[in-house]
Each structure stands twice: as structure tokens, then as C-alpha cells.
């Protein structure tokens, strides 16, 4: 088990202590640092900055949105960052949702699984640099020969040579079909709101992908990077209460009423009625009431909270469930140091 630092995206500006957090993560033996994007700051530029200030931490996107860039442009980012960082880059990709894809990027959200498969295939072709890139799929045809084409496009391969032709690609996935696809075509799964209580169910989804012809990985060499809030405290009830507004936001505000992939995660955990109530209250603007409706048990399913012994026990449970890296958010250097100290022996350190 390893620890990664999740620094997310800017809301609305980068935290002023971010350089200190990254330096502490490197000093305290964290394995990686990840950046995200939504509809503001991008996921790649901060990694270039942090990479210049570190020498060991792996640098990942969790996640870069497919619709933000063509596959070739995304591969160029990956190729460049991996070279600049000395082979430390991890490309984490995700489809986002229709509100962002259609509302922000102005693209249709249709067939997200098929688009993901094509996208990853093109990125791997670019990074392999074995031949000019060709894709006959409907979503990202290369060369483009559709409406408006001049007919002058030709297959190309990058003029810059990649440091690694096999930069790790991980996928953010929540539903069973997407998780199975991730196991088939990716090097790891970026899991959000993972609960060890459903480890057997996740294993079924993953095994479906591993069993497909041409699957890239198997269970033994596949990474599961689970985003997780860890709070070391003697006030367990207080920490649980503090987490509820965040969960209410994801359940009610990070998707449409009829299509919210985050809400579906919690329904599959066994909270369908509560999720419906939380979503309705949140969309009506009754956010405090929505947070109050979040069950304690739901928070405990997806959060690691308690004293050092309780935290170590929960981390061990997640490791038994298949998690290889816990991706945690930290508000300050002291929290980075506390997690490092508490989890020595449970988390693999590279000091």
C-alpha cells in the first residue's frame, strides 16, 4: 500500500501552501501527487510546476477529462511531462459527465465507453511511436475525412521521442461496465468513494475485464488508486458530521437529476432512498437539510476516520480489498506528517 497526495483543482485559486504540501509529501515518503480538473484550472500545468520542485514523487492526473483535448493532444501532454519529470508521469483519464461535456466543452456525451476505448488506443499509439497514427473509429477518426475535410490529412507520428513508450494510463470509473473496461485496457483504476465492504463486487467487475481477450493487465500487476478522506481524530462523530456537506454536494450537485454517476455509486452501496432524498433537497437549495440526511454509515463506508489504531485497521482493510494506493487530501503540512507517522508499517514508504 502506498500514499498519494490529491491536490484537486483550484477553487477558486490554488491554495497558498501547495508548494509546502508537495515538499512535505516528498519528504515524508508519499508515492505520488495528483491534480484534477473540472471547468477551471487544468490538470497538467500544476504537475509540471510540482515536478520541477521534486525528484521522486510520481505525478498523476486524477482525472484529465477526455473532452478537454483530442487524444493526440493529450498524448503530447503525457509525452512532454513524462520526459520533463524523468519518467514519473501517470495519465489518469475520465469521461466526466454530460453537464460538463455538453455544457462546457460543447461536445456530445454519447457512447462514453466506446469513446474511452478509442481515446486510450490513440494515446498508446502516439506514445509507442511505432508507426504513423491511424484510427478508423467513429469518435476520433485519424486522419479526419469527414464533413469539411480538405482530404489533405495524413497519418503522423510524434517528432518528439517519448522517454517511456508505456506511460501508465489509469481510468476514473464508477459503474460496473466502466470498471470492467478499465481492467481490460488500462494499467490502473482511479476509484472514487471506494468502500472495502463491496470489495467482492469490485473484484467481479474487474475480473470481467481481465478475462477479455487482449486484456493489458491481470489482478497481480494492476493498480487500484482509491481517493479517500483520512482524518486522524479522537472526535469521530465530529469528523463524520464535517464530511456530510461534501457528500451531499456530490450526491445532489455533481450531476443532473436523471444522470449522476456519483449518486449511483452510493445507491449501489445500499442507500437508494437516502440518495434520492439528499439529491432532491440539494437541488431545491436546501443544502443544510441535504447534508443532515446523509447517514453516518454512508460516511463511514467511504471515509477513514478515528484515532491512529482505528485508521491503521481501516487502511489494512482497504489493502485486503485490493487497494494499492490511497489518494488523500491534506490541508496542511502537519496533516501530511501525521498521516506519514501514523501509517508507518501499513503504508510502503520510499525514504
Segments and roles (model prediction):
Residues 1-351:
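Active-site-adjacent structural elements that line small-molecule/cofactor binding pockets in enzymes
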